[in-house]
Amino acid sequence: MESRKLISATDIQYSASLLNSLNEQRGHGLFCDVTVIVEDRKFRAHRNILSASSTYFHQLFSVAGQVVELSFIRAEIFAEILNYIYSSKVVRVRADLLDELIKSGQLLGVKFIAELGVPLSQVKSISGTEQDGTAETLPSSSSDKSLDMEKSKDEAQDNGATVMPIITESFSLSAEDNEMKKIIVTDSDDDDDDDVIFCSEILPAKEDLPSNNTATQVQPNPASVAISEVTPCASNNSPPVTNITPTQLPTPVNQATLSQTQGSEELLVSSASTHLTPNIILLNQAPLTAPPSASSSLPNHMSSSVNVLVQNQQTPNSAVLTGNKAEEEEEIIDDDDDIISSSPDSAVSNTSLVPQADNSKSTTLDGSLTQKMQIPVLPQEPPSNSLKISDVITRNTNDPGLRSKHVMEGQKIITLDTATEIEGLSTGCKVYANIGEDTYDIVIPVKDDPDGGEAKLDNELPKTSGSEPPNKRMKVKHDDHYELIVDGRVYYICIVCKRSYVCLTSLRRHFNIHSWEKKYQCRYCDKVFPLAEYRTKHEIHHTGERRYQCLTCGKSFINYQFMSSHIKSVHSQDPSGDSKLYRLHPCKSLQIRQYAYLSNKSSAMPVMKDDAVGYKVDAGKEPPVGTTSTPPQNKSTFWEDIFIQQENDSIFKQNVTDGSTEFEFIIPESY
C-alpha cells in the first residue's frame, strides 16, 4: 500500500485582492444591495460586507430593508469608515477629526477604529488640543506631515529593518500565537498637513529580550513624541518588560543618557506639566467576557516603579527612549491579565495615573521634572469587572463620626475630577455629581461576601486597627449596569454600551441585546431576535403590510426608511420636522395580544400573592349614581385574570365592545 501525501497551500495575497475587488465593485455600483443615507449623501455598499465589519449593521440589516438612514454620524466621518471597511486602511485623516472618528467607530461597532484611541492617546502630537494652556502644540512646520493608518501583517524579522520610533503594545494571547501589536510613528517630507501612523500586527520571534537597551537620540519633527509602554509579557514565567526598538534619525539636536535601574523602567516624555491633585487611584477595567465571580488581587510586593521625566525647554527637542528589563524571576504574569485594560471602555491611559500628585515634583535636570508612579503587576488569576484601588485617600472631613459611619456600612468615598474617569469604574459603584465643584463622588461597596468565593488578602489589616487595607477587593453587585446620580435623580447606565435609562426595568430589557437571555424567534422563518419589537419589524417583511402612509400623496410604505426617502425625494420635505407628513397605522396582519379593559373599579388595591401584580385604575373617579361600591374581597389576582387572551379573534380591536367609553388599561404587546 503506497503512502499518500497531503499538500496544503495558502494564498497570502487573497484577502487583499478580494478587498480590492470588492472596493472596485462598490466604486462602480456593481452588486450593491443596500443604500446608506447619511445627511445629504447616499452610499452604495454590500450588505454582507457591512454586516461582517460592523456589529451595528449586523443587527440593523436583520430587520431593515435595502435603504437605511443614519442620523447620529456625519457623512464625512462615515465615508472614512466605509473606506476602511473596503480597504482595511484609514488614510489621511485630519487630526481634529480623530476623536469623532473613534466615537463613530464605537457606535457602529467597528473594532479597529473603536480601539484606535488607546494607542493614539500615547502620542501627544496627534491630539491637537492644549492642556492647561501650557502644553506644546503643533507648529506651522507640521504642515509637512501626513497621517496614514495601515493595518497589515508582517514577519517578525521585518522588525529590525525600520528606521522610525516604535510604540509596542502587548496583548495576552495563547501560547501558540503570542501575537503583539505595534504602532510605528514616523514623519515624512511630503507636502501634506497630517501626521503618518502605520499600525501593523506582527508575530515576534520567541527569544528573550536583551537586558539592557541603549538610549538613542531621535530627531523627529518638532513636538512629535515617542513613548514606550510598560506592559506585561504574554508568556508565562517572564517579568514585565518595556518593548522598545531604538532608532536614530539624521541631525540629532541633543543627547542624554539615563542610568539604568534594576527592576524599573524609565520613560522620557516631552510635554508640559498639567494640573494635578493629591489623590492617586488606579483603575482597571477587565474584559466583559470575564466571569464576575473571578477577581484578581494586587499584592504590595508585586509592583514595578516607573519614573516619568518631563522636559520643559524653550526650543522643541526630541524624546529619548530607554528601558530596562526587570530581573524578578518569581513574578508570574497570567496570559489573560493586563496592567490596565486597552478596551475602549477603559477611560484611563496605560502610562498615566489619574489624578496625579502636584506636590511630588523635584528638579533633576535643566528645567526638567521627575515624578515617581507605581504600576501594579497582576498575579496569576483571572480578571474580573472589579475596581482596583491603590492608596485611596478618603475624602477629607472634620466629622469623625461621618467617616466611621461609611466604614461601618461597608462604603468608601473617593473623588474624581473628570467625568471621563467614571467609565473605568466597576459595577456596583454609585456616582454622585457635584455640579458646583465639577467633581464626582464615588461610593464604593467594600463589604466581603462570604458566598462570593473571594479569599481575603494575606496582608489584610484587622478591622479593629481602624485603617482599611489599600488593596481590598471589591464585590461586584451588578453585572449589567452602574448607577449615576445627578441632582438626586438616578440614572442607570448600561455597562456595555453606556446607554442611560431612568427606569431599571427598561435597562434590564435593553440588556437582553447583549446577554441574549431571552430569544424571540420569527413565526415565519428561523431568525431569532433579542427584543420583541425587532421581531415585529422583521415579521412585517413577511406579511408585506404597509403601515406608513404619506399624507401628501396617500402612498403607503413598509417601513419608515422607504417613507422618509419618498418624502425627501418626491415632495422635497423633511419628515422629521415639526409638521406631520405621515401616518402610522396599527398593525393588522400580526398576532398581537389583545388589550385588556378593566370596567370594575375598586377603591383599594386587591390582595396579591408574591408572584402577582395588581394595578389601581381610575382611583380618583367617583362611582356612577345609583351604584353601590362593594368592599374589596380577599381574592388573589393573577396575570391571566388581567390579560384576557381570546383564541378566535387575533386581530387588534380599536373599539371597545363592553360598553365602556374610554381606554382604562392599556399595555402594548411590544413593551
Curated annotation (Swiss-Prot):
A zinc finger (C2H2-type) spans 492-514, 520-542, 548-571. Residues 145-156, 451-461 have a biased composition (Basic and acidic residues). It is found in: Nucleus. One of its GO terms (molecular function) is sequence-specific double-stranded DNA binding. Residues 1-136 are annotated as: Self-association. Keywords: Activator, DNA-binding, Isopeptide bond, Metal-binding, Nucleus, Phosphoprotein, Repeat, Repressor, Transcription, Transcription regulation, Ubl conjugation, Wnt signaling pathway, Zinc, Zinc-finger. This is Transcriptional regulator Kaiso. It comes from Mus musculus.
